[in-house]
């Protein structure tokens, strides 16, 4: 069982300047009041982003963010 949700992890990736694509995603998601903040389900978050996140230029960015999230959870 994961100790924290994806959104909580994503917020640790925010960076105001010189951000990579995942950090830019985090910056934009911060302002998305409808983001499924409590979800830990890849499919649920992915569907939400596909339908409601014009700030995400490519789902590959989400896939990379999810990989980093899973890797960070393995370190805990």
Curated annotation (Swiss-Prot):
Protein name from the UniProt record: UPF0346 protein OEOE_1017
Similarity annotation: Belongs to the UPF0346 family.
SUPFAM superfamilies for the chain: YozE-like
Any matching Pfam family: YozE_SAM_like
Matching NCBIfam families: PRK13672.1
HAMAP family named in the record: UPF0346
Stretches that traverse the bilayer: none
Top-level taxon of the source organism: Bacteria
């Amino acid at each position: 069982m994961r100790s924290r949700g994806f959104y909580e992890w994503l917020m640790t990736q925010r960076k105001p300047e010189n951000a990579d694509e995942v950090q830019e995603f985090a910056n934009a998601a911060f302002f998305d009041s409808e983001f499924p903040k409590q979800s830990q389900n890849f499919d649920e978050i992915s569907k939400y982003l596909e339908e409601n996140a014009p700030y995400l230029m490519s789902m590959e960015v989400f896939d990379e963010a999810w990989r980093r999230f899973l890797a960070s959870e393995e370190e805990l």
